[in-house]
Amino acid sequence: MSKPVIRDIKVARKELEKEMIKGLLDYVRNGVFPHNSPNSYMNAYTIVQGMADLGDPESELLFNYYNNTIQGFIEDCYKLIAKESSNQLIDKFIKLTENINFLIYWMSRIFTYLDRFYTKAKSKLTLCESAMTSYKVHLFDKIQHNIYIEVNKLIKEDRNCNTESRNKIKIILKIIYDIDLSAPKIIKEKNKICWIQDGGVSNRDETQYQDVWFDKYFQSETNKFAKDKANADIHNMSAPEYIISQLKYLDEEEIRQNEYINPKYKSKINEINYRFLIGENAQELSKMDTGIPYMFNTKRNEELKKTFQLFKLYPQSLEVITNAFQPYIKKRGEEIHSNKEISKDPKKFIPELINLKREMDNLVAECFENHPQFQDKKNKAFSNFMNKEIYSKQLSNYTDFCMRNGFKGKSAEEIENTLNDIIGLFKCLNSKLLFQLESNKKMSDRLIKNVSLSTNTEKNFISKLKQESGVTFVNKMMEMMNDLEKNKKEIDAYKLSASKGAPNGIKFNIQVISQSAWEINKKSMEKIEMPKFMTACIEDFEKFYLRKHSGQKLIWCLGLSKLDVQFLYLKNKNIAITTLPQFLTLLQLEKYENISIGKVAEILGCQVSTVITDIHGLVFNPSYNPKGEPEKGVIIGTFDAVKKEFKENDNISINKNFTVARQKFNTLPLAVKKSQAEIKENELEEAQITKRYQDNILQATLTRIMKSRIGQTTTHVWLINEASKQIDLFKAQPQQIKENIEKLIEKNIIKRSDKNKSCYDYIA
């Protein structure tokens, strides 16, 4: 049988206190657990429901009773804590807040019926909102200053490795967080009473109380702590110790932030820590005896790695590391260059540079995580010390060595790695144009002499250069490779002609190449007087070729020809690989027995210097005369045997006592040491060729720029700067750009502006 509805507030209060509220208050005040009956809660809830159903006046009386009960207890709590010492304040505050929450939880459950209709209809605060407001006004607002100070003390202890107070910190900051809830709701979860944001209300990110704590208290405390720590550590630790200490502290700080700091403040806390622990002391770390330059010079990679891990947290400080990194690379590179024994030999010089490049690449990858800033500084450092012509020339020489015999016996993977290393250094060259010119020349020589180990490797290298610098850069190289393929088809067709590719029974092989692509020494194009059986071979091929390619002209590079010549007068009838001038010289010696070098040149119709070069191979080629003994050459004569010098008036003759162990040997001329005058002449010629190419590139670039700016104002200074930016094959100097601007004006491609003589216009 149900109880009658209570209609009087005084009676209702008395019954509510009897059923549950008196017991709750006794518990939160004295810790005496209430001995209510199992039905006490339902009885109390039913009383509230019955009274509220009577109408608004009764509901309002119940609402006021709810608020007054909670407020009264909170005010009593304030009296208990108001004069509490700082040592006991936090513990007392936490305990009282737990009691308040306990009371609010059960009171809100008893009176929850009011939230269904009354508080909504009257636009009043919910029971939980009203209780939280009372907590703020009558307790927290009055003691928040002291609470903020005390919680900061606890955090300072935590930062000083005393983690015992961490749980208290979490509780206090959770209380502050709860106070800021825009729609607070108290619940019981896993036997623990806690506040949450009401899921039925939009969550406004309000942090009023948290902001007061952070902005007015904690931020300045963090500032002071970080500053003091940085100052103490920098004066009492070595650079590596300092780095490790800060990394450890920041790791611990992140744990603290994750455990009890609102994520909203994380960036501000980090900014303070990074500024003092990293930014303020970065330069000092570099200056220390054990600092960043020392780490580089002594290859302390693990220390550099940790330094980067710290400094990357404050990116503007990375410059301190890169400012030490760039000079370090430059110093290492210049040490290699200054070692004359190494730098003169491309087979030693370039591998040393490759090893340095690999080492720096690995350093950037392993210690600096391939950070773009370090990649950029590394590349600039290499470009900075590789700004001399020797680097372009020696890299080209090394590539030539690899293609001729350096790759012999190497695996495909080893060859690929070496090619990539060469390209890696190529990227750093200031004068890529010089490398291009030298490489074209050397590739031409390899392919003509058929001394390249692999055309596939040649093609692979061309492909890598093309990928790096574009198709224009490798035009000549590609054309040379195309010529080889076309020539193979041409020779196959010639072998099917009437002479079968062997006129008069002489096996005859020809390379047809385009003059525009190949680097051919003009001396090799000199006409040479030949016996009829040889001219018949040339005439036979010309007849075949010009029948297919009418209108074209063949220029014979006889100076590049090689022959297999058998020495019938020798006991073993040995065979020698000779040049055409060498063979023709031997024919003259067979005819005249003894003849001057000048006379041979006259008969052959070529320069004396050409004959001397070839005679040198007939006497001193190490394939048959390793000790360079003049009496053991294919020919002998009156030349200077000590200096190994030949003159126009020196007489030569066949050495009939010549012997050689090999059945087939080589008499091809070796590079003869040039005089200083010849060296200077060659250098001047190369410089002129290089400048001519540079001027062509500059004029093409300037024309392209001006053509794209028709109708726009182009100043002299802007044009020079823009041209300098766009040219990457060499470092264009302002004076050189200016000279080519004048050349374009002379060619009527551009003109000075009528309105302003310091500006230029394109002549359409």
Please identify what each model-predicted range represents.
Residues 1-764:
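Eukaryotic scaffold/interaction segments
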